UniProtKB/Swiss-Prot annotation:
Pathway: Cell wall biogenesis; peptidoglycan biosynthesis. The gene is murG. It comes from the Bacteria. PANTHER family: GLYCOSYLTRANSFERASE, UDP-N-ACETYLGLUCOSAMINE--N-ACETYLMURAMYL-(PENTAPEPTIDE) PYROPHOSPHORYL-UNDECAPRENOL N-ACETYLGLUCOSAMINE TRANSFERASE 1. GO terms for molecular function: UDP-N-acetyl-D-glucosamine:N-acetylmuramoyl-L-alanyl-D-glutamyl-meso-2,6-diaminopimelyl-D-alanyl-D-alanine-diphosphoundecaprenol 4-beta-N-acetylglucosaminlytransferase activity; undecaprenyldiphospho-muramoylpentapeptide beta-N-acetylglucosaminyltransferase activity. Its EC number is 2.4.1.227. This is UDP-N-acetylglucosamine--N-acetylmuramyl-(pentapeptide) pyrophosphoryl-undecaprenol N-acetylglucosamine transferase. GO terms for biological process: carbohydrate metabolic process; cell division; cell wall organization; lipid glycosylation; peptidoglycan biosynthetic process; regulation of cell shape.
Length: 376
C-alpha cells in the first residue's frame, strides 16, 4: 500500500481541510500519515482514520534560537520519512510544514504544496521551486513567482465531509414587511431547511483571534439594528469567549430576540443549516465551506493575518459579488448595522450572492486527490 504524508498545523483552518483530504485518499486505498504540531493536537479525534505524528517547531524571532530548533526538527522529520518511505508529501503552508518539507526534499520525496488563500504565503512561495505541482483554491492568486505558473493546478479548497453533506442550504428571503420565506436556491441533491422558519438568522463566529472583537461589535450593531427596525424578527447564533457571554446574553435578552451564544460549536454544519447570513473572519477554510453551501457572508478580515491574506480573500469575494468585506480598522457598530439592514431589506442581493458562490464551488477533495495520484 502506497503511503502519503500530509503536513499541516497551526490552526484548525489548516488542519481540518487536510484531514478531509486524508479521508478521501484513504477511501482510494492509500495509507495516510499526518504530521502536525502541538497546537493542532486538540483537534485530533479517535474516529479520524489518518495516522497522526506530532512534530513541533516553536517559532522565535531570534534566529540563533530558531535555527537550532529547525535543525533538530528537520532531523526528526528525516528519520520519520525515511522509515515511512512515502510516495509523496503534501504541505498546506505555514511554518509547521517547514521541517517535513525540507526532509522530503532531502530524501527526494516528491512534494505538492496547496495554497488555500488568494495570496501565496511565504513558506509556500519558498518551496514552490521544489514542488512538482502547486494546487490553489483561487484562479486569481497574488504573490506567485513567474516560474511557478506552469506548476499551477486549480483544485479549490478541501471542505469537511459533514459540510459537504449539506449540499445546498435552502436560504430564506425575508422582506421586512412580509417576513415571508421563499427558497433562494433549489436543491441540487438535497435541501436542509432552517429550524427557525420565520426568523432571519445571523451566524457569527470569529475563531480564537476574532471572538473578542465580535463580542463587542456585534451586540452593539444588533442594538442599533433593532432601534431602526423594532419589528424585525432575528435569531442570533454567536461564538463568544466565556468571559463575554453574560454581557452578550443580557443585551440580546433585553432586545427580546432569539439567540444562542457558545464558546465553540463542535459541528458547524448545524449552525450553517439555520443561517441566512454569516459574519466572520476571512480564513480560507471558512470561505471554502460557505462557498460550497452557497451561504453569503460579511467578512471582517483579521488585520494581523500573515501577509494580510484574509483581506485579499475577502476582497476577491467582494469583487465577485459573492460576499462583503468590511475592514476592521474602518468598521463601526453603525456601519455594520447598516450593512445588515441593507441585506435584510434587499433579499435579491443575498440570492445573487448565494448563486454566485455556488458557481465557484469545486469538489476540492476529489480534484486534489486526483492531482496527488498523477504525481505518484
Amino acid at each position: 500500500m502506497k503511503k502519503i504524508i500530509l503536513v499541516a498545523g497551526g490552526t484548525g483552518g489548516h488542519f481540518f481541510p487536510a484531514v478531509a483530504l486524508g479521508e478521501e485518499l484513504i477511501k482510494r486505498g492509500y495509507e495516510v500519515h499526518f504530521i502536525t504540531d502541538l497546537r493542532c493536537k486538540q483537534y485530533i479525534k479517535q474516529d479520524m482514520k489518518v495516522i497522526f505524528h506530532i512534530l513541533d517547531l516553536k517559532r522565535s524571532g531570534n534566529i540563533f534560537l530558531f535555527l537550532p530548533r529547525l535543525s533538530i526538527a528537520v532531523l526528526k522529520a528525516i528519520k520519520l520519512l525515511y522509515n515511512m518511505k512515502p510516495s509523496v508529501t503534501v504541505g498546506f503552508g505555514g511554518y509547521p510544514v517547514i521541517a517535513p518539507m525540507f526532509a522530503a526534499i532531502f530524501l527526494r520525496v516528491p512534494i505538492i504544496i496547496h495554497e488555500q488563500n488568494s495570496y501565496l504565503g511565504k513558506v509556500n512561495k519558498f518551496f514552490a521551486s521544489f514542488a512538482k505541482k502547486i494546487a490553489i483554491s483561487y484562479e486569481k492568486i497574488k504573490n506567485l513567482p513567474e516560474f511557478a505558473k506552469s506548476k499551477i493546478v486549480v483544485t479549490g479548497g478541501v471542505v469537511r465531509e459533514n459540510i459537504r453533506e449539506l449540499k445546498v442550504i435552502e436560504m430564506s428571503s425575508r422582506g421586512l414587511t412580509t417576513g415571508s420565506k421563499k427558497s433562494l436556491i433549489k436543491a441540487l441533491d438535497s435541501v436542509v431547511k432552517p429550524r427557525h422558519d420565520k426568523l432571519f438568522t445571523i451566524f457569527i463566529f470569529g475563531g480564537s483571534q476574532g471572538a473578542k472583537l465580535f463580542s463587542e461589535l456585534i451586540p452593539a450593531s444588533i442594538q442599533i439594528l433593532m432601534q431602526k427596525q423594532p419589528s424585525l424578527e432575528l435569531n442570533i447564533i454567536q461564538q463568544a469567549a466565556l468571559d463575554d457571554q453574560v454581557k452578550i446574553k443580557d443585551i440580546y435578552s433585553k432586545l427580546n430576540i432569539t439567540y444562542e451564544v457558545a464558546e465553540f460549536f463542535d459541528n458547524m454544519a448545524l449552525q450553517y443549516k439555520e443561517a441566512d447570513l454569516v459574519i466572520s473572519r476571512a480564513g480560507a477554510s471558512t470561505i471554502e465551506e460557505l462557498t460550497y453551501i452557497g451561504l453569503p457572508a460579511i467578512f471582517i478580515p483579521l488585520p494581523s493575518a500573515a501577509d494580510n491574506h484574509q483581506y485579499y480573500n475577502a476582497q476577491l469575494l467582494a469583487d465577485e459579488k459573492t460576499g462583503w468585506c468590511l475592514e476592521q480598522n474602518n468598521i463601526s457598530a453603525g456601519k455594520l448595522a447598516d450593512k445588515i439592514l441593507d441585506l435584510i431589506s434587499n433579499p435579491k442581493i443575498l440570492e445573487d450572492a448565494s448563486q454566485n458562490l455556488l458557481k465557484r464551488r469545486k469538489e476540492g477533495h476529489k480534484l486534489l486527490s486526483n492531482l496527488i495520484e498523477e504525481v505518484i
